[in-house]
Amino acid sequence: MIMYATAVQTINSFVRLESLKEVYGLIWIFVPIFSLVLGIITGVLVIVWLEREISAGIQQRIGPEYAGPLGILQALADGTKLLFKENLRPSRGNTPLFSIGPSIAVISILLSYSVIPFSNHLVLADLNIGIFLWIAISSIAPIGLLMSGYGSNNKYSFLGGLRAAAQSISYEIPLTLCVLSISLLSNSLSTVDIVEAQSKYGFWGWNLWRQPIGFIIFLISSLAECERLPFDLPEAEEELIAGYQTEYSGIKFGLFYVASYLNLLISSLFVTVLYLGGWNISIPYISILELFQRDQIFGTTIGIFITLAKTYLFLFISIATRWTLPRLRMDQLLNLGWKFLLPISLGNLLLTTSFQLFSL
């Protein structure tokens, strides 16, 4: 009986250990995801505040100043206001499409953050096809916009959705060709491998210098994918009121608002990863890898800071562009994508392939 009781206690202890392992496993799954989502939300709030301050400076006026010190809580106040607004629905619209559209737009963009390396090995999912996963997922967002436009039963909304789909198709191809050129140089589709390939040669090893034409095309295509001026045709106020967002209010309108800034942030992060060396500081005699070997936490913190500093540099350029260039017409937008960017990006890919073949 004593041996039997001892065996039962041993089995129970093993069962408890296994259950604890499962609990800890679930915790370590949700903690990184929660941390990433919290960081993304904070980043979006910072972008909104920066855009308002930079826009105010360019227009020589005073920006937000009442909601918190220097107006840093203005975006949070606007989001809270949208949460408590009434959620209206068009009486003759397609309710399922109208309701699902904003969620598809936000979720598809959020999934793209899983392959972004914020520092050395600090990535949610280091996949062998990470860069193609981003391209595949980002092509889903325009479907949500088209569903929203069609489900609104409004001619302005429907035109905005059609414009969003046409614009996405026109600029997705040049952007993909630029990514293929980077993959050929790095011999990998993993975002971590692409950053490490640039880190081997320091500052001059950045793909910005090895692919200057691809960088310019990627920059233009990213702005078009984010529907930023001068490419904001799907929601042109003077022509379509608010485009596919015309019939939305409350939290659903807020989701579209958040999706646009999420898309801008993810595009800026991919510019940093693909062309600006990612977390690599690229200063002589200072190596992030050495910092990791000495103090992993300190090295990770420095890597995150460097990645975000490069990202917000591109964000500043996109915000300044908004108040610098006039909006294009729809025919000019499509001509730029199909007649100029597509042939140039294809030629750039062929040149990159030729150089890689001759270097073997």
From Swiss-Prot:
Domain of life the protein comes from: Eukaryota
Protein EC: 7.1.1.-
Pfam families for this protein: NADHdh (PF00146)
UniProt GO molecular function: NADH dehydrogenase activity; oxidoreductase activity, acting on NAD(P)H, quinone or similar compound as acceptor; quinone binding
Enzymatic reactions: a plastoquinone + NADH + (n+1) H(+)(in) = a plastoquinol + NAD(+) + n H(+)(out); a plastoquinone + NADPH + (n+1) H(+)(in) = a plastoquinol + NADP(+) + n H(+)(out)
Gene Ontology cellular-component terms listed: chloroplast thylakoid membrane
GO biological process: aerobic respiration; photosynthesis, light reaction
Main location: plastid
Ranges annotated as spanning the membrane: 27-47, 98-118, 129-149, 165-185, 203-223, 248-268, 269-289, 297-317, 340-360
Keywords: Chloroplast, Membrane, NAD, NADP, Plastid, Plastoquinone, Quinone, Thylakoid, Translocase, Transmembrane, Transmembrane helix
Subcellular location: Plastid, Chloroplast thylakoid membrane
Membrane topology summary: Multi-pass membrane protein
Statement: the UniProt record of this protein carries the keyword Mitochondrion: no
Record's subunit section: NDH is composed of at least 16 different subunits, 5 of which are encoded in the nucleus.
Free-text function comment from the UniProt entry: NDH shuttles electrons from NAD(P)H:plastoquinone, via FMN and iron-sulfur (Fe-S) centers, to quinones in the photosynthetic chain and possibly in a chloroplast respiratory chain. The immediate electron acceptor for the enzyme in this species is believed to be plastoquinone. Couples the redox reaction to proton translocation, and thus conserves the redox energy in a proton gradient.
Protein family according to the UniProt entry: Belongs to the complex I subunit 1 family.
Protein name: NAD(P)H-quinone oxidoreductase subunit 1, chloroplastic
Lineage, highest ranks first: Eukaryota, Viridiplantae, Streptophyta, Embryophyta, Tracheophyta
Gene encoding the protein: ndhA
